Every structure is written in structure tokens, then in C-alpha cells.
């Protein structure tokens, strides 16, 4: 499955954007999308048009309305799909059919069949797909990935990642959906960690995992529903091994069962050194290197932007104009989804499960890549 990138777009200048979904996460995106000079947000849409209107007025977006308003807007080239996960594929497919490139908030899809169908539809139409997470484009992870690709740790051999918390029900006012099909610690947080591992090692070849849940019922701890019980449908502790096409391997823990919170732990070990990466749920953070013979970590200053959500949309827009491949592709997101579904299948079967898809590591951003710089001038 390819991502169309062979020729520059026929349009010139700033890339037009339409946002579908005016919920809470839209604020995090619009904080950046409305300030990147290479983008122009023309419209925000939502099933609840009053929500779209309020968000448009908050950010000075000239137009708002229902979903069709964004899909049919003549100046919109990229749809930023911030709908609920269950609607991601439906909205993305409608956008592709309308001739729009699509950036989707994670998850790319809830299952292999619909995700693969979306990839095929976009490929046939010559449409680009991009998907969160784009945190690996931030200064922290880009600095670490450049060190790996430059050979500073030798040949990458192993990876370890950890995400452990007591679970979100103590602070989240409506946490039940995080314990249902398509969520849990694996599908909620796994994309950040597994995407980082794919960037470090390349495609995942096979996985093995075990999982468990300590409780069938949990209790909401805050907000208007405090004290209400809800059913836990998915494993809340997952321990997964992955082997990559390169021969490297990794071990990851994703848990809502730990009284002690430990998150953002990512270490990559090579033949010459171990690299400690920043939290893959963030765009910045320290990078530390421990070479053979060292007695302590050496901190490597992070270089590059750490603007936050929307950097993947901007990279997609600039790549669209240049006719080059963007980095946070739909293929990458589908491969991570495929790996997570395979992990779930391994928990059920007790065996290794092959990951059929592939997604090579993306090219690093140039060190002088600057979101705040206008690069797409009219007529250029």
C-alpha cells in the first residue's frame, strides 16, 4: 500500500484546512493550526453546529457548519478528522470520496478490515492519509531518532517501554469508554510507544503477549458520576514482546493496574550504547545517552520544534506541495493498529502472532524545520 507522493500538488501557497469535530481535543489542534503560517483553517464542522460555531468564533475561523460544509469547501485540501473513534473511518472515507486529503486523530480505525479498506480507497483515489500520534516529530524524539539513525548507539538491538498507572477512573469524570473495546491501556496509550519503537527499529514482524484484569467492575472517583460503577471489558494489564524485521526485539508494559505511576519510559539499547528517550506522549523532553564504559548518563540537548498537536498536519501540507512523502502516514498508523490487534490475538491464543503489514521508519525532519516559518508563498 503506497501513499501518493510522487508529484507536487497543482495548487500553490498556503494549504487550506477544514476541521471536523469541535470537541475538547480540537482546542489543542487549533492552538497550533491557526498559527502555522503555511496553513489556513477555513472551516470547522461538527454534528452539533452550535459547537462548531463557538469554536470558530473562539479561533477566528471564518466558516462553520455541519460535516458536509467542510467536505464540500472548495478551498479545503486537508480534512483534520477529530471525531469520536467509532466515526474515524466513516468520516475519513467521506473526505477521501470528496477528494480531500485526511489527517485523523488516533486511532486510525478500530479493526483491521475497516482500516485496510480506508487505505485501499485512498490509494485508489490518489489521496494522502495521515494519522496521530505525531509526537515523534517533536524535538525530543526527533533528536533521539537522529542519534539512532546516525549510528551513535551502534546497531539497535532491544527496546523497553513502560506505561503504568492506577487507571483514569480516579480523575476522569466519565472513564467507562477507556475500559471498553478499542481502548484499555493497550489501545489508548500503545500507539505512542509502538510508533516510537517502529521509528527506532522499523516494521514489527511478530508479537507475543499476556494480559489480565484485576477487576471486572470499577468505580468512578470524581465528577458528577462519582461512586457509579462500570464494567471493565478489556485487559487492564498487558505485557507484550515484539520482534522487528531487523531482528531487534522489545518488551512493553501497558497497565491501568499499578498503584505507582510510571510512564514515558522508553530505552533503546544498541551494540555501543543505551539511549533514554523522552515521553512519547509529549513533543519535548530530555534525551540521555549511556555509552559503553560510562558511569552516568550524558544529556543530549534536544533540537527542533516542540509545538504540539498539529505538527503532523503541517508536515503533510508541506510534503503535499513538495511532492514528497509525509512522515506520520496512514500506513504507519495502520501498521501500529495491526500490531495492537495482533497483541490482543496473542493474549487470547497464547502464541506468537505474525504482523502482516509493514511500515519502515520515517525520514527525520531537517534540524532547521520550523513550523512558525512561512515556506509556502503564493506563486512559489
Language-model region placement:
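Contiguous beta-strand/loop segments that form the cofactor/metal-binding neighborhood of enzyme cores
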Residues: 2-3, 195-283, 311-322, 343, ...
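N-terminal Rossmann-like dinucleotide-binding module
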Residues: 2-59, 377
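Glycine- and charged-residue-rich phosphate/anionic-cofactor binding loop of Rossmann-like
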Residues: 40-42, 297-301, 319-336
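Conserved SAM-binding strand-loop segment of SAM-dependent methyltransferases
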Residues: 60-67
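Hydrophobic residues in well-ordered beta-strands that form the structural core
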Residues: 65, 103-104, 129-131, 252, ...
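Beta-strand-loop-alpha-helix segment that lines the small-molecule cofactor/substrate pocket
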Residues: 73, 77-78, 84-85, 89-136, ...
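Predominantly a Rossmann-like dinucleotide-binding segment in NAD(P)-dependent oxidoreductases
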Residues: 135-231, 350
Amino acid at each position: 500500500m503506497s501513499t501518493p507522493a510522487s508529484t507536487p500538488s497543482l495548487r500553490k501557497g498556503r494549504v487550506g484546512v477544514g476541521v471536523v469535530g469541535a470537541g475538547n481535543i480540537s482546542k489543542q489542534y487549533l492552538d497550533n493550526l491557526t498559527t502555522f503560517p503555511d496553513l489556513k483553517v477555513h472551516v470547522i464542522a461538527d454534528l452539533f453546529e452550535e459547537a462548531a460555531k463557538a469554536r470558530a468564533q473562539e479561533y477566528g475561523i471564518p466558516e462553520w457548519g455541519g460535516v458536509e460544509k467542510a467536505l464540500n469547501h472548495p478551498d479545503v485540501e486537508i480534512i483534520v478528522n477529530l471525531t469520536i473513534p467509532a466515526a474515524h473511518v466513516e468520516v475519513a472515507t467521506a473526505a477521501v470520496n470528496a477528494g480531500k486529503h485526511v489527517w485523523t486523530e488516533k486511532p486510525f480505525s478500530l479493526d483491521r478490515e475497516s482500516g485496510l479498506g480506508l487505505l485501499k480507497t485512498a490509494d485508489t483515489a490518489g489521496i494522502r492519509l495521515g494519522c496521530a500520534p505525531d509526537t515523534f516529530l517533536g524535538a525530543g524524539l526527533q533528536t533521539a531518532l537522529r542519534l539512532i539513525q546516525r549510528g551513535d548507539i551502534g546497531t539497535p538491538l532491544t527496546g523497553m517501554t513502560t506505561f503504568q498507572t492506577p487507571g483514569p477512573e480516579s480523575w476522569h469524570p466519565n472513564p467507562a469508554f477507556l475500559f471498553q473495546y478499542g481502548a484499555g491501556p493497550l489501545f489508548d496509550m500503545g500507539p505512542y510507544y509502538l510508533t516510537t519503537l517502529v521509528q527506532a527499529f522499523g516494521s514489527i514482524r511478530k508479537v507475543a503477549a499476556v494480559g489480565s484484569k484485576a477487576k471486572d467492575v470499577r468505580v468512578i472517583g470524581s465528577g458528577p458520576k462519582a461512586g457509579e460503577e462500570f464494567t471493565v471489558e478489556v485487559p487492564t494489564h498487558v505485557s507484550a514482546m515484539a520482534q522487528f524485521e531487523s531482528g531487534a526485539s522489545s518488551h512493553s508494559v501497558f497497565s491501568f493496574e499499578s498503584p505507582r505511576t510510571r510512564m514515558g519510559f522508553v530505552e533503546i539499547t544498541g551494540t555501543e550504547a543505551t539511549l533514554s528517550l523522552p515521553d512519547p506522549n509529549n513533543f519535548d523532553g530530555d534525551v540521555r545517552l549511556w555509552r559503553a564504559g560510562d558511569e552516568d548518563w550524558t544529556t543530549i540537548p534536544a533540537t527542533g520544534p516542540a509545538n504540539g498537536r498539529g505538527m503532523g498536519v503541517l508536515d503533510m501540507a508541506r510534503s503535499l506541495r513538495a511532492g514528497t512523502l509525509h512522515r506520520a502516514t496512514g500506513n504507519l498508523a495502520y501498521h501500529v493498529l495491526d500490531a495492537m490487534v495482533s497483541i490482543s490475538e496473542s493474549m487470547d491464543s497464547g502464541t506468537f502472532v505474525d504482523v502482516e503489514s509493514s511500515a519502515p521508519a520515517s525520514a527525520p525532519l531537517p534540524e532547521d524545520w520550523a513550523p512558525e516559518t512561512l515556506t509556502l508563498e503564493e506563486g512559489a
